[in-house]
């Protein structure tokens, strides 16, 4: 059994990494929906920020999420596509980019850091989301977007 808490973050939509590094404040603003899954217990829980691939969220992702919950970890699903009125980027990788999803992940991290139920925060992703998890460890990005993640899995 687990609890789901929904929250939103104010994010940005940079087209490419260069825009994060040079002019993030001039990129379009967007509100991104997130779902925080909490395992049984009191916490604080380690948390995995989870990012989908180009097909968006699929049923098999829930198997991984359930595994993390069963292991006592919280999971934060970020809905980067739906929040931008996109279902998939399989045929158009430019409609939602990994740069946009990077900002979403760091903005969600900022909110989670304030939650007393959450301890250390890692990041994981599938396919496109894995690219985000990889770039989230790059120091120039971390210096601009916020605190580093405690773990990375892509």
Residue ranges and their predicted role:
Residues 130-143:
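Short glycine-enriched nucleophile-adjacent loop
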């Amino acid at each position: 059994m687990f609890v789901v808490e929904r929250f939103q973050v104010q994010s940005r939509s940079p087209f490419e990494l260069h825009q994060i590094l040079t002019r993030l404040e001039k990129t379009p603003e967007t509100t991104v929906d997130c779902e925080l899954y909490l395992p049984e217990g009191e916490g604080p829980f380690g948390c995995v920020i989870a990012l989908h691939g180009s097909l968006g969220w699929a049923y098999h992702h829930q198997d991984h999420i359930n595994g993390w919950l069963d292991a006592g970890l919280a999971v934060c699903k970020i809905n980067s596509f739906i929040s931008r009125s996109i279902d998939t980027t399989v045929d158009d990788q430019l409609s939602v980019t990994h740069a946009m999803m990077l900002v979403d992940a760091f903005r969600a991290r900022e909110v989670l850091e304030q939650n007393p139920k959450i301890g250390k925060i890692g990041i994981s992703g599938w396919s496109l989301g894995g690219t985000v998890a990889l770039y989230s460890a790059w120091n120039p990005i971390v210096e601009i977007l916020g605190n580093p993640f405690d773990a990375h899995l892509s």
